[in-house]
Amino acid sequence: MRTRLTDRTRRLAAALGATACVIALASCSTESSPESSSPTSSAAPSESGAGTYLALGDSVPFGFRGGATADFSDAANFVGYPELVGEELDLDVVNASCPGETTASFMDTKAQSNGCDNSLQSGFGYRTAYPLHVLYESMDQSQLDFAVDTLTENEDVELVTLQIGANDAFICQQTTPTRCSDPADLQALAQTVQTNIDTILSTLRDEAGYDGQIVVVTYYALNYSDAFGAATQEIGDGIEQVAEANGADVADGYEAFRARAAEVGGDSVEAGLVLPNDVHPSDEGQRLLAEAVLAVAED
């Protein structure tokens, strides 16, 4: 069990930006072709002889960062914790994550996402405008379908991670009168996330026949001292129960940031773990998430 990252690995982490930034930028960008850059990995078997690590999820594992300096036309510019974990474990990374993915759009590309295939505000989809780290067979292939195909076609997958659900919360905030602060809305959100993650994990186990290690990564709180921070923990607890029911391990992203945030009153931004005016981890935040995965990864 590895729990520490090498200095070389630490330097690979990249800061991330807000999903709203990329939606705004992409709407007026001329570099909108997903073929403008080759994917950095694919579902093909490892050519190096090392095992494969399949990373699934949203903008956090994707390595998303926004802002005017981000080059969205080249997926290699975006590095998340899966690349840190892959280097530490000497595994080839197949990172199928998509910024803005929800638990529903993970299974069905026509379901509501928060910027992966579509968005509430503009209908913009990141994967229709810019390349991901992998090349999907078509725009209709969901991330779950990609995962099932990868697992059934390749026998060398040693690790799968899944981090999904935060964009469900952002959708809830945008579509409910109380911005998802009402207990009934929070309960409905938690139930939806748990039900969909249960379906995702059971599909990986049963349809794909994968019996290797799956690690579900829970989310950090933006602020551990406010009500939504407490709700993040409650949702994470529910995700943990679903993970365990499907024979998956849990990397506790909530606890990964908690102690450092507590030193500055609970604010993950003030602690340097989340980028200012953003929801995505800084390079240090990505490093802590990688260490959370490594803490439960099997040698």
Protein language model regions, located:
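Bacterial N-terminal signal peptides that target proteins for export
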Residues: 2-16
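C-terminal motif of bacterial Sec signal peptides marking the signal peptidase cleavage site
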Residues: 23-27
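Bacterial lipoprotein signal-peptidase II cleavage site
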Residues: 28-38
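Oxyanion-hole/transition-state-stabilizing segment in secreted/luminal serine hydrolases
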Residues: 62-66, 115-187
